[in-house]
A protein has these predicted regions:
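Extracytoplasmic small-molecule ligand-binding "clamshell" domains
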Residues: 35-105, 109-110
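Short loop->beta-strand "edge-of-pocket" segments that line small-molecule binding or catalytic clefts
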Residues: 36-50, 57, 134-152, 242
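Periplasmic-binding protein-like
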Residues: 42-46, 120-123, 199-238
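Extended ligand-binding regions for polar small-molecule ligands
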Residues: 58-70, 131, 142, 152, ...
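Short beta-strand-to-loop elements that line the ligand-binding cleft
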Residues: 74-82, 148, 164-175, 209-210
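Short helices/loops that flank or line small-molecule/ion binding pockets
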Residues: 79, 84-96, 112, 173-192, ...
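A ligand-binding cleft/hinge motif common to bilobed small-molecule-binding domains
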Residues: 99-109, 185-214
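A conserved helix-loop-strand patch within extracytoplasmic ligand-binding domains
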Residues: 116-160
Length: 257
């Protein structure tokens, strides 16, 4: 009888120890893997993402932070001067992703594009004095000298469509320098970015004409290398983006005051 009483707790302890060993072997690595910090490139692209007074700002940044909080995902922001630098860092695995961005073939080679967090409207901007310019005309495409931020998606699109592209700067604010000095006839960038730069640089909006060219999804890129280590990240991310939109709708529907 005493032998049986002794064996029972020993057996119970062995079972618990075995369960703990199995958890350490299979569950713990998965739990640790899920906590791998996301190193995210954030281009200087007002009003979506930018740095001001040493802090991160922009509604693209705020949306990203909200989505990561929903996922309970740790992240580290890596500020980038432009999209070209951000994509290179993603290609060399210096960062694990990029936000916010529109989709293109080059980025799709090394990363996966999420559901849309927002939409961006690529817009032509030109001096209002230039009444001869019609961006939707054949002559504009054939003759107008245009520009966009170097290696940005608008720049790559203009090159692919065989526009006469010149003087593409790394700094998006320099586009207006090119335009105001009449070194180019028109520039292309998102409408909200154009308005944000005008405000930051104290430019008079009444001096410019604007015309929407196209509207595209603005989302989050996660590198394929990171996904290989964390295969559940994209479905979870897309679900979190959907919940983010639902929360925004609920917030917008609430009466103010």
């Amino acid at each position: 009888m005493l032998c049986c009483l002794i064996k029972t707790p020993i057996k119970s302890c062995c079972v618990k120890a075995l369960r703990f060993f199995i958890w350490c072997c299979f569950c713990l690595p998965a739990a640790l893997q899920a906590k791998e910090t996301l190193r995210m490139a954030m281009p200087d692209y007002p009003p979506y993402t930018y740095i001001q007074n040493g802090g991160y700002h922009g509604f693209g940044y705020e949306a990203f932070v909200s989505i990561m909080a929903d996922l309970q995902q740790d992240f580290k922001i890596v500020p980038e001067p432009n999209y070209g630098r951000a994509v290179k860092d993603m290609q060399s695995q210096v960062v694990d992703g990029l936000f916010l961005a529109s989709e293109n073939e080059e980025r799709n080679k090394v990363a996966v594009f999420s559901a849309a967090v927002a939409y961006t409207g690529w817009t032509w901007v030109w001096l209002k004095q230039r009444t001869d310019l019609k961006p939707d005309s054949i002559s504009f495409k054939q003759d107008a000298v245009v520009s966009a931020q170097l290696n940005s998606n608008p720049y790559l699109w203009l090159m692919k469509q065989h526009y006469k592209v010149a003087g593409a700067p790394n700094n998006i604010r320099m586009l207006f320098t090119l335009l105001n000095s009449r070194r180019v006839d028109a520039i292309m960038l998102p409408e909200l970015t154009a308005k944000a730069v005008m405000q930051q640089e104290k430019l008079d909006p009444s001096l410019y004409s604007m015309q929407l060219e196209m509207q595209l999804p603005f989302g989050i890129y996660i590198s394929k290398a990171y996904i290989a280590r964390n295969p559940d990240i994209m479905p979870k991310l897309n679900q979190a983006i959907m919940r983010y939109h639902e929360q925004q709708k609920e917030f917008a529907s609430k009466p103010s005051g």
